[in-house]
Regions:
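Conserved NTPase motor "head" modules and their coupling/switch loops across ABC/AAA+ ATPases, GTPases
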Residues: 1-32, 174-304, 313, 317-333, ...
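Conserved lysine of the Walker
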Residues: 37
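Nucleotide-state sensing region of NTPase/ATPase domains
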Residues: 48-132, 141-144, 148, 206, ...
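Helix-to-loop junction immediately C-terminal to a conserved catalytic motif
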Residues: 45
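A conserved P-loop NTPase coupling/switch region
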Residues: 107-115, 119-185, 189
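Walker B catalytic acidic pair
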Residues: 308-310
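Structural recognition of the conserved hydrophobic beta-strand(s) that form the central parallel beta-sheet
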Residues: 73, 333-340
């Protein structure tokens, strides 16, 4: 059993001070737009990932007119409980602790409180560039393999250093070969590690996505999913040598695992070029539910599932199937937001499990 049982928000987004007690595993949160439904889910996400689900600085989560925020949560894990606290100080310093013991490195927290979120803007995972899909893969893999997260952090640091080196060298038309060689070796070591882990993981994960898509989609689609990486056919060292003059000219590293993507095709055509809105929704939910299943299998318990405004994305039948899947087939704690109390209540009553409604 893994669940968030209590959440206290102080000066977080639109909340001055609010405490929530979660007595059930199925929790519906209703209220008008702007009432704080998404912010509540984001607070739970913060406690799981040490950061917001939105790509924004921590300071933007501080309530207007306040200097910092505090998020405190109590999580049930099997028969015990753990207290997690995130504080943003007035000076912009963030502190994170578990059971009153502060983390020296926030990365040590990732994976201890697994979580999957489905939100309105997630369609960018399908429609936007490769960065969105890499972020999805990295967020999932980092919850599964801590050494992967450490190597990823290291890779991004070395990549930034190499890009700074290229800018300096390009502007002066001169560079230190020994420093370049050190950066190259570090980038290759970490990049090869990341590539091997992604390849091994995606060979298992992508078939799971495909199975989820088949069960969700009501049409007979020929969907193909493939890991797309420059390192699949050419060694990283060779790529760096081939691209050095171009990298120097552009002042950035143009090859490596930071360019990886998922090649998604529908009937042999790039998915985002031909897929309907319904097919895009189906693939989005397939990827998220595959992540949910992967975490559940790896951790031995299901992750917390945060569903933000999904009633607006799915028709009644698909919504019922989704709730039935996550609420009846697993013991997962599920948070669902909606503007309509009646719609939440009716949906929960149909699946026949105890639920809690919270109005904002």
């Amino acid at each position: 059993m893994f669940a968030c049982r209590q959440l206290t928000l102080t000066h977080f987004r639109n909340y001055s001070f609010q405490r929530f007690d979660f007595t059930q595993n199925i929790i519906g949160i209703f209220g008008r737009n702007g009432s704080g439904k998404t912010n509540l889910l984001d607070a739970v996400y913060y406690l799981c990932f040490t950061k917001s689900s939105f790509s924004r600085p921590d300071v933007q989560s501080v309530k207007n007119g306040c200097a910092g925020f505090r998020i405190e949560g109590t999580f049930q894990k099997n028969d015990g409980s753990e207290k997690v606290v995130c504080i943003l100080r007035e000076n912009g310093r963030k502190e994170f602790s578990i059971n009153e013991t502060s983390y020296q490195r926030f990365s040590d927290h990732i994976g201890k409180f697994p979580c999957v979120m489905i939100a309105p803007d997630d369609v960018t995972l399908i429609t936007e560039g490769s960065e969105e899909r890499r972020k999805f893969i990295d967020t999932l893999l980092s919850q599964l393999q801590h050494d992967y997260l450490e190597q990823l952090i290291g890779y991004n640091k070395v990549l930034q250093q190499r890009n700074s080196f290229l800018k300096f060298a390009s502007e002066r038309n001169d560079w230190d070969e020994s420093l370049l060689d050190i950066l190259k070796k570090q980038l290759i070591e970490k990049g090869d590690f990341i590539h091997r882990r992604r390849l091994a993981f995606l060979n298992i994960f992508l078939p799971e996505v495909l199975q989820q898509y088949i069960s969700i989609a009501s049409h007979d689609d020929m969907l193909e999913l493939k890991y797309d990486s420059q390192l699949m056919n050419v060694p990283f060292e060779e790529l760096l040598q081939q691209n050095f003059q171009r990298d120097l000219y552009l002042q950035r590293t143009g090859c490596g695992v930071h360019k990886d993507d998922l090649d998604i095709r529908l009937n042999e055509t790039p998915f985002k070029n031909v897929a309907s809105q319904g097919q895009r929704k189906s693939l989005l939910f397939a990827m998220k539910l595959a992540a949910f299943e992967t975490l559940k299998e790896n951790k031995g318990f299901p992750p917390i599932l945060l569903l933000d405004d999904v009633f607006e994305k799915l028709d009644e039948e698909r919504m019922h199937n989704l709730l039935e899947y996550v609420c009846l087939n697993t013991s997962a704690q599920v948070f669902i937001t909606d503007t309509h109390e009646e719609r939440l209540q009716q949906a929960f009553m149909k699946i026949g499990k105890d639920f809690q409604l919270i109005g904002l």
